[in-house]
Amino acid sequence: MTLEHIVDMYGSSIGKHLVSRRVEMNNEGPFKGVKTYRIELWDADSHEIIETVERTAHITLETKGCIMEALELGIIRKMFEHYASK
């Protein structure tokens, strides 16, 4: 199940959300070649970031999917924690 499916399933009960995924490559200094994988959960009504999870590492194409999957699980957990605390 993808993060979009989770947001679609629970969005009506916990508010509308947008999900953004970004990969940033550091091309300077001692961390040249390091990528930061980031997923942000946005509140669609207020246009504010609710939660962010990220992972920084030297990554090969074979492991990229595993990292994004782990980040999606992390943001799903944070999404439910955020609304459970309200």
Each model region followed by its residue ranges:
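Generic early N-terminus positional signal peaking at residue ~5-7
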Residues: L3-V7, P30, A84
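Active-site metal-binding core of divalent-cation-utilizing nuclease and nuclease-like domains
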Residues: N26-E28
